[in-house]
């Protein structure tokens, strides 16, 4: 077994950590093993790892029997991985892709995503995950090691954590927080506590277009201190991308719901179910030659 500390030492011998990439490498074997374990039985399954860096998590994924698809943006780390995991690459147990995970095409079929992701790409990565789901299919499970504050917002840990990120994620995923990982478990140590999040896809209700809900939520939280009556006066920026929707229909629907009590609330006052119900009422307003 290739030990995590040795893998990190070998990569750092090639170059110092790139701060612009948010490189904090997990070296605690117990945490690495636990993260992989949260994904369940990975034998023969296609697993996407984003930002493998020195390969500490990659090693544990390979030991689980997974077929690993790893996307790494750092060219030096890619070369290190090619040399260190040459046999795994030759046997196609590891497929290594050099590029930015936010713009590089992911494999069409992914059974799981398991990653220690750079903190600065956490939010945009969730958007990419969502887009991949609608273009292809959702992975059975997503296990991410992220900054604890982000984990709380992602999983809606408390009502105070409600924001567009957590609400939109909850529309299509169940999410939970698992173990905390202290700074000392990384090299170099980050300044904050980290947390493991587990996401699993849930069935979407068919009575409302989830895209309408997402756009409405984003528009409302853009002015989170305003009541919905004010923040939703203007239609969402990308509303016209939704079939049957345009600015005139939006304004007509909002006018028809002028007495709706929800409009006197602020976005953080609404639960996920309340957002769905409100958007269902929006969509059900009769369209008359608009």
Where are these regions (language model features)?
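Catalytic cores of RNA-modifying enzymes
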Residues: 1-219, 277-278, 283-290
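An accessory alpha-helical subdomain
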Residues: 192-195, 199-201, 206-255, 259-274, ...
């Amino acid at each position: 077994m290739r030990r995590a500390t040795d893998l990190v030492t070998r990569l750092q011998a090639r170059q110092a950590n790139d701060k612009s990439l948010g490189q904090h490498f997990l070296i605690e074997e117990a945490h690495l093993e636990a993260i992989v374990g949260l994904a369940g039985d990975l034998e023969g399954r296609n697993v996407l790892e984003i930002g493998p860096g020195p390969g500490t998590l990659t090693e544990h994924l390979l030991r689980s029997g997974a077929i690993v698809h790893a996307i790494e943006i750092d060219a030096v780390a890619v070369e290190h991985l090619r040399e260190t995991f040459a046999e795994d690459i030759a046997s196609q147990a590891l497929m290594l892709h050099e590029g930015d995970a936010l713009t590089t095409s992911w494999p069409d079929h992914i059974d799981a995503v398991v990653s220690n992701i750079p903190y600065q790409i956490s939010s945009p990565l969730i958007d990419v995950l969502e887009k991949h789901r609608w273009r292809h299919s959702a992975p059975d499970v997503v296990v991410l090691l992220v900054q604890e504050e982000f984990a709380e917002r992602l999983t809606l840990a408390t009502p105070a954590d409600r924001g567009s990120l957590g609400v939109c994620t909850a529309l299509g995923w169940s999410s939970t927080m698992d173990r905390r990982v202290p700074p000392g478990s990384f090299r170099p140590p980050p300044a904050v506590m980290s947390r493991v999040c587990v996401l699993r896809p849930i069935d979407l209700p068919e009575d409302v277009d989830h895209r309408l809900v997402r756009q409405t939520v984003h528009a409302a939280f853009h002015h989170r201190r305003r009541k919905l009556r004010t923040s939703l006066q203007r239609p969402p920026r990308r509303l016209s991308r939704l079939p049957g929707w345009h600015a005139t229909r939006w304004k007509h629907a909002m006018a028809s719901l002028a007495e709706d009590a929800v409009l006197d609330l602020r976005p953080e006052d609404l639960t996920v179910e309340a957002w769905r119900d409100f958007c269902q009422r929006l969509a059900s307003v009769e369209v008359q030659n608009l």
